[in-house]
A protein has these predicted regions:
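Conserved beta-strand segments of alpha/beta enzyme cores
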Residues: 27-29, 97, 139-141
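A generic structural signal for well-ordered alpha-helical segments
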Residues: 21-24, 91, 135
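Short catalytic/ligand-binding loop motif for oxyanion handling, primarily in non-cytosolic enzymes
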Residues: 12-13, 73-74, 107-110, 151-152
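Alpha-helical scaffolding segments of alpha/beta enzyme cores, especially the outer helices
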Residues: 79-93, 122, 126-133
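Active-site segments of SGNH/GDSL-like serine hydrolases
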Residues: 92-125, 145-147
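Conserved SGNH/GDSL esterase-like catalytic core that processes O-acyl groups on lipids
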Residues: 2-6, 10-85
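Short, well-ordered secondary-structure micro-motifs
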Residues: 41, 111-112, 153-155
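Catalytic His-Asp segment of secreted/periplasmic serine-dependent ester chemistry enzymes
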Residues: 116-192
Length: 192
């Protein structure tokens, strides 16, 4: 099984692709850049976009994981929805299954959340709604990592010191959540 991950530092922090590969026994490849939005993965004029388009055109994948910039589903929802739609088209042309990696609200009471200017519950709700809507409209699998973080936020520290990026436990929770969704689908299709 081959998995491609398109996104940013929420993927490469703590080497989440290696964690996902270990759990799924799949080959996992990432195409990431810190701060990247999904729109950039579609732009052949950027290094990241040219590579993403090449990977989708020239290599065979079973699953392609899409992860938007941390607050992008809220601050640029229209752009996010359009990017998911376009990427899902390219992913399906490849014969792969799109998976949305739904990310989390910034750390409760953390400096990143304070800078963003909304409360934790509101950010969680808006992120959850945006990813759920994108998954429904595009018929994708949804790895709801944001909800997994939300459920554990009172009992576990899942964040790096910046209040945005995951610590190792957070990346592991993300890998487990993504793996669970992919393995369930793969088993149903006889791939796992």
């Amino acid at each position: 099984m081959r998995i491609l991950m398109l996104g940013n530092s929420y993927i490469f922090t703590n080497d989440l692709p290696s964690m996902l590969a270990e759990i799924t026994s799949a080959e996992v490849v990432q195409n990431t850049r810190g701060g990247a939005r999904l729109r950039e993965q579609l732009n052949p004029e950027t290094k990241l976009g040219a590579k993403a388009l090449e990977l989708l055109q020239n290599e065979k994948w079973d699953y392609v994981v899409l992860q938007e910039m941390s607050n992008g589903p809220i601050t640029a929802k229209e752009n996010f929805m359009q990017s998911v739609k376009e990427l899902c088209g390219k992913i399906r042309e490849n014969g792969a299954v799109p998976v949305l990696y739904a990310t989390w609200a910034y750390q409760k009471d953390g400096k990143q959340l304070q800078k963003f200017g909304i409360d934790y519950d509101e950010m969680y709700r808006k992120m959850h709604e945006a990813y759920a809507e994108a998954a429904e409209k595009n018929h994708t699998l949804l790895a709801d990592v944001g909800s997994a973080f939300y459920e554990k936020t009172e009992t576990e520290n899942l964040f790096n010191d910046d209040g945005s990026h995951p610590n190792e436990a957070g990346s592991h929770l993300a890998a487990e959540t993504i793996a669970e969704v992919i393995l369930k689908d793969a088993k149903r299709k006889g791939l796992a």
